[in-house]
C-alpha cells in the first residue's frame, strides 16, 4: 500500500498542473522565488514605485513618466519684469512682419534697379505724359505700398501686458522700421469707436489698436480692458433734455 501510494504521488507530481499554474511556471520568477524560499517582488504602485512591505521599504524606482509630464507641462515664462503679466498675444505677428519686410525689400530693389535698367536698355518716352505715368507707377510700388501697409498694420498689437501694481497696460506694436514699440496706457485712456472699424478695436489715448477678442486666454482680461466689467449708468434726465432741445 505504501509503495502504491508513493507511485501515485509521483505520477501526480509528473503530470502538468492546471492552466493558471502552468502560466505561473512560464513566468519563472515567482515560481523560482517560491522554490528558493525568497520573498516575492512587490507590485508597482502608481508612478513606478515599489510598495512598502511589513519588514521595511524596498528601493524606489525613479519615475521617468512623472519627469516627462513635468517637462512637457512647463512652459516659457509669460511675465515681463517691466510690463507685467501677458494677457494677449496676436497670432498674425509673423505674417505682418513678413509682409512688411517683403514690401520694403521690393521697394529698395525697385529704387536701385529701375534707373540702372533704364540706362542699360535705353527705355525712353517722347511723351511727357507717358514719362509721368511710368515714373508714377514705379514710385507707387516703391513708396506708396510700404506706407500703406504701415498705416494699416501699425496698430496691430503683437503682445499686451497688464501690470496690476500700476494698473497699466503695455501694447507692443511694430514701428516704421519694423522694431517693436511699447505704448503704455491706463484703462481710462481706452476709447471705443462709435462706428466699427476694420483695423481698429479701440483707441489708447489717440493711437488706434487692433486686437482679436477670441485670443485672450481669460475673457475677463478683455472685459477689463474694454471697460465692460463696469456698471453702466444712464442719466434719463439728460436724455430727456437732449430730446426736448431737438
From Swiss-Prot:
GO biological process annotation, one example: protein complex oligomerization
Family annotation (InterPro entries): TMEM70 (IPR009724), TMEM70/TMEM186/TMEM223 (IPR045325)
UniProt entry keywords in alphabetical sequence: Membrane, Mitochondrion, Mitochondrion inner membrane, Transit peptide, Transmembrane, Transmembrane helix
Transit peptide boundaries: 1-79
Cellular component GO terms held in the UniProt record: mitochondrial inner membrane; mitochondrial membrane
All ranges on the Mitochondrial intermembrane side of the membrane: 120-131
Membrane topology of this protein: Multi-pass membrane protein
Parts of the chain on the Mitochondrial matrix side: 80-96, 153-246
Superkingdom of origin: Eukaryota
Location in or out of the cell: Mitochondrion inner membrane
UniProt key word Amino-acid biosynthesis: no
Principal subcellular localisation of the protein: mitochondrion
TM ranges: 97-119, 132-152
One annotated GO molecular function: mitochondrial proton-transporting ATP synthase complex binding
The keyword Transmembrane helix appears for this protein: yes
Entry function: Scaffold protein that participates in the c-ring assembly of mitochondrial ATP synthase (F(1)F(0) ATP synthase or complex V) by facilitating the membrane insertion and oligomer formation of the subunit c/ATP5MC1. Therefore, participates in the early stage of mitochondrial ATP synthase biogenesis and also protects subunit c/ATP5MC1 against intramitochondrial proteolysis.
Recorded family membership: Belongs to the TMEM70 family.
Name of the molecule in the record: Transmembrane protein 70, mitochondrial
Source organism of this protein record: Gallus gallus
Amino acid at each position: 500500500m505504501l509503495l502504491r501510494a508513493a507511485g501515485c504521488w509521483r505520477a501526480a507530481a509528473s503530470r502538468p498542473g492546471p492552466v493558471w499554474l502552468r502560466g505561473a511556471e512560464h513566468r519563472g520568477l515567482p515560481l523560482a522565488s517560491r522554490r528558493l524560499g525568497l520573498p516575492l517582488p512587490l507590485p508597482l504602485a502608481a508612478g513606478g514605485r515599489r510598495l512598502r512591505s511589513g519588514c521595511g521599504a524596498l528601493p524606489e524606482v525613479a519615475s521617468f513618466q512623472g519627469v516627462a509630464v513635468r517637462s512637457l507641462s512647463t512652459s516659457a515664462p509669460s511675465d515681463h519684469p517691466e510690463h507685467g503679466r501677458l494677457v494677449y498675444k496676436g497670432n498674425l505677428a509673423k505674417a505682418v512682419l513678413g509682409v512688411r519686410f517683403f514690401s520694403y525689400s521690393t521697394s529698395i530693389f525697385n529704387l536701385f534697379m529701375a534707373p540702372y535698367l533704364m540706362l542699360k536698355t535705353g527705355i525712353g518716352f517722347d511723351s511727357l505724359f507717358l514719362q509721368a505715368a511710368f515714373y508714377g507707377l514705379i514710385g507707387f510700388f516703391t513708396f506708396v505700398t510700404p506706407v500703406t501697409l504701415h498705416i494699416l498694420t501699425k496698430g496691430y498689437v503683437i503682445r499686451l501686458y497688464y501690470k496690476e501694481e500700476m494698473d497699466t497696460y503695455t501694447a507692443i506694436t511694430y514701428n516704421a522700421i519694423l522694431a517693436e514699440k511699447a505704448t503704455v496706457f491706463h484703462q481710462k485712456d481706452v476709447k471705443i469707436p462709435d462706428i466699427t472699424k476694420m483695423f481698429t478695436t479701440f483707441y489708447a489715448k489717440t493711437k488706434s489698436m487692433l486686437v482679436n477678442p477670441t485670443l485672450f486666454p481669460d475673457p475677463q482680461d478683455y472685459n477689463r480692458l474694454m471697460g465692460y466689467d463696469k456698471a453702466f449708468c444712464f442719466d434719463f434726465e439728460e436724455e430727456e433734455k437732449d430730446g426736448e432741445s431737438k
